[in-house]
């Protein structure tokens, strides 16, 4: 198979879809890999490293899309890429269709086969291709939140861990999945007073056993969220419904409960966000205010640490990518239920129910 690895062009997206090690695995199996020039530079991989691994370098993104049977990316195609995706082409990347109607309709129109990292799902309902980036995003959410709590950055000027005689900052984490757990553990390690909430009592019971003493668990409800917002300095939203829009758990009227200069970090923004006042931002312009509350809603948080993120992501994606190229997408997805759940849009049809429901599009069950 001919595989293409384009350079990511989303704002400040510095990751790359395949490392030289991945290229080597592909080429030794007889596949051909084309990498766009400088695609891996920001992740620490030179064009020469790709060439040494067996890749061929192409100068433009148009060249890569035109020749490849399969595209391996990190983030969803942006508007300028829509015309490049063609009928029958397999695109393996994060899509987050439920957050973008234009993207969904463009991929339906293209006739491509869209296999989304975020909906590849194991029998235990874990999401193996989302976990590594969720680990990064959870840690980064606290790191960025801490930075923007500083007064010169627009926050209220609180130190996360406090000092002797001065209370630490209060961090409220909504959602106790991979992102939330990583965020709570990171904030606790910095000495903050942390509360994490979720709708799953078994999950909270588990966290109560394994988390540091400065992490408290709380059952998620509108009442409890409102109460926590009254004293929270940093709120991290990390709610996920696989493939679907995130629920809006913090409404605009709730912002009036918070102190001015408090910070909201919405890690769920790539699924539409879990705060009513959230809208996607970029690493160049990451924040904005609503009613005196600082919002950080960058949709590609891990893109700021591309070396770590690229290695973590490709460690997880490569085994699945190898199945797709060795067997072809139909047989690979027929043989592997985990991969099959990654199919969202196939040859003009939406085959993932939550995506169809998000935009009122016809849903067609997958036929392999």
Predicted features, each with a name:
Residues 69, 75-76, 95-96, 221, ...:
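Short glycine-/small-residue-rich Rossmann-like dinucleotide-binding loops
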Residues 76, 136, 177-178:
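Residue-level detector of alpha-helix initiation sites
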Residues 2, 8, 79-169, 298-300:
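Glycine/serine-rich phosphate-binding loop and adjoining beta1-alpha1 elements at the start
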Residues 209-291:
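Rossmann-like adenosine-cofactor binding region
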Residues 6-45, 152-237, 287:
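Glycine-rich phosphate/diphosphate-binding loop of Rossmann-like nucleotide-binding domains
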Residues 2-106, 110:
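An N-terminal-biased, well-structured beta-alpha scaffold segment characteristic
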Residues 118-144, 148-159, 269, 274-368:
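Adenosine-phosphate binding glycine-rich loop
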């Amino acid at each position: 198979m001919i595989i293409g690895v384009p350079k990511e062009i989303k704002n400040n997206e510095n990751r790359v879809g395949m490392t030289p090690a991945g290229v080597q695995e592909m080429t030794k199996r007889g596949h051909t890999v084309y990498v766009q020039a400088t695609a891996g530079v920001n992740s620490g991989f030179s064009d020469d490293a790709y060439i040494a691994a067996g890749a061929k370098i192409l100068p433009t993104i148009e060249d890569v899309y035109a020749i490849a049977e399969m595209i391996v990316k990190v983030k969803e195609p942006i508007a300028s890429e829509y015309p490049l995706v063609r009928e029958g082409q397999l695109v393996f990347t994060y899509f987050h269709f439920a957050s973008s109607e234009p993207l969904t309709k463009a991929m339906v129109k293209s006739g491509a086969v869209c296999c989304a990292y975020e909906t590849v799902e194991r029998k235990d309902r874990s999401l193996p291709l989302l976990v590594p980036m969720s680990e990064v995003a959870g840690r980064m959410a606290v790191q960025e939140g801490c930075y923007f709590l500083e007064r010169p950055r627009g926050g209220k000027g609180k130190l996360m861990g406090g000092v002797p005689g001065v209370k630490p900052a209060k961090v409220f984490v909504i959602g106790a999945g991979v992102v939330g757990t990583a965020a709570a553990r990171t904030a606790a390690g910095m000495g903050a007073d942390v509360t994490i909430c979720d709708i799953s009592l078994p999950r909270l019971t588990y966290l109560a056993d394994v988390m540091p003493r400065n992490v408290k668990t709380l059952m998620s409800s509108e009442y409890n969220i409102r109460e926590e917002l009254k004293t929270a300095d940093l709120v991290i939203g990390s709610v996920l419904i696989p493939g679907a829009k995130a629920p809006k758990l913090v409404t605009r009227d709730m912002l009036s409960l918070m102190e001015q200069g408090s910070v909201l970090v919405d890690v769920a923004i790539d699924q539409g966000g879990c705060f009513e006042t959230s809208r996607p931002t970029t690493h160049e312009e990451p924040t904005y205010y609503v009613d005196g509350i600082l919002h950080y809603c960058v949709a590609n948080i891990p893109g700021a640490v591309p070396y770590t993120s690229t290695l973590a992501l490709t460690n997880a994606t490569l085994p699945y990518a190898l199945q797709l190229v060795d067997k072809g997408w139909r047989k690979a997805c027929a043989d592997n239920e985990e991969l099959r759940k990654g199919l969202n849009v196939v040859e003009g049809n939406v085959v993932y129910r939550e995506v169809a429901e998000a935009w009122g599009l016809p849903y067609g069950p997958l036929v392999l």
